[in-house]
Amino acid sequence: VWCTAYFLFDFYCDFEEKLLLKSQLLHPEILAALAGGGHGAQVLIADGNYPSSTHAAPNARRVYLNLAPGTVSATEVLRVIAAAIPIESAQVMQPADGRDAPIFTEFRTLLPGLTLEPLERFAFYAQSSVPETCLVIATGEQRIYANILLTIGVIPPP
């Protein structure tokens, strides 16, 4: 599957005037990581404060979209990822006071039918560091506790 994503990327680079994918997701490294991930793999969308170099699986592919503060946002990334893959579950880093972070409302809107599972900060770090985490996307999101860990689901047969 990774070879297919690489072929598409290579083909796209050769013929830039043609849009090859119908999806909103066009980033070649993210496409390759998702294609290689499969059912049960995890994707971390990290805010601008998340220590993604030290608190994520060492073998996970890292994509840095944190061009500037606020760009690209965690919700922009989640919207595109959620449209591209089936999502089985979602975990969030819960603030120390136990309340929901304001961004959780937006996460719920983007993931209808899923319950956000809150994890204490260090439990979230531990879960993000398991070998099943195949992709870490560092965003420029400035809102705190805007980290979400997605588990890739399955597409049922027709």
Regions found by a protein language model. Name each.
Residues Q94, R99-P158:
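Glycine-rich, aromatic-bearing surface loops/beta-hairpins
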Residues H55-S89:
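A phosphate-binding glycine/aspartate-rich beta-alpha loop in the early core of alpha/beta enzymes
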Residues N49-T54, N59-R62, A82, R108-T109, ...:
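Short, solvent-exposed amphipathic alpha-helical segments in soluble enzyme
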Residues L21, L25-E29, G38, P69-E76, ...:
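Conserved active-site and cofactor/substrate-binding residues in soluble primary-metabolism enzymes
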Residues G38-A41, N59-A60, I87, P131-T133, ...:
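Short coil/turn connectors at secondary-structure junctions
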Residues E17-L67:
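Long, hydrophobic N-terminal alpha-helical segment
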Residues C3-L19:
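Short, Lys/Arg-enriched N-terminal segments with co-localized hydrophobic residues
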